[in-house]
């Protein structure tokens, strides 16, 4: 049965909406951010892909999903099922010269094309290579968000060039990249002076006049100073 609300009638027509508190007010919704996910297959494990895309979904919608590599090489065969499952477009890039990474160049060229030709809100750059540092900075200069993904060995220059950086070993489905470095125990965290100082600074910088700090504001301060800060890294 279809419910039909009867609106009260006045001398000037139907009653104004303010007189009908039982009707829900339709608030305008903000469309999700549109991201391009560009993956350097040579510098990330296929086991991290499911968790990586789930992380991207926390920020918006992956409108473009491409992965770059020389697919004639046997070491990239592990990607096949993952690409089919997640509808990711593989981009073939042959290695023209030993020691020169043509994959990086192809990814950077595509990123610049997308930057100027597509209506995107941000990029997800998946690599542990410092060659993408300038690309991340250039995208941010255009006012778009950059989220980086990579291993813990990723050079600091690339990490800090991103708005947000996520280590792939903490993503669901990803195997630990360095078993020799387990998560810190609570007792060890108490001795992590750098972490304590960072948290204290973020809280103090976010305090209002009454001495309270909003958690969201604290998180924003942390990201501004350390883009790869992630509570999941500390247990």
List each language-model region with its residue ranges:
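N-terminal regulatory modules in eukaryotic regulatory proteins
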Residues: 180-235
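P-loop/Walker A NTP-binding module and the surrounding RecA-like catalytic core of P-loop NTPases
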Residues: 65, 133-137, 142-147, 155-157
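Conserved phosphate-handling catalytic cores of large alpha/beta enzymes
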Residues: 159, 163-176
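Acidic beta-strand-to-loop metal/phosphate-binding motif
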Residues: 68, 121-128, 135, 139, ...
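Short, glycine/polar-rich helix-capping loops at beta-to-alpha or helix-loop-helix junctions
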Residues: 75-80, 150-159
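Intrinsically disordered, low-complexity linkers and terminal tails enriched in Pro/Gly
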Residues: 21-32, 171-191
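Domain-level signal for Mg2+-assisted phosphodiester chemistry and nucleotide/NA-binding surfaces
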Residues: 21-116, 145
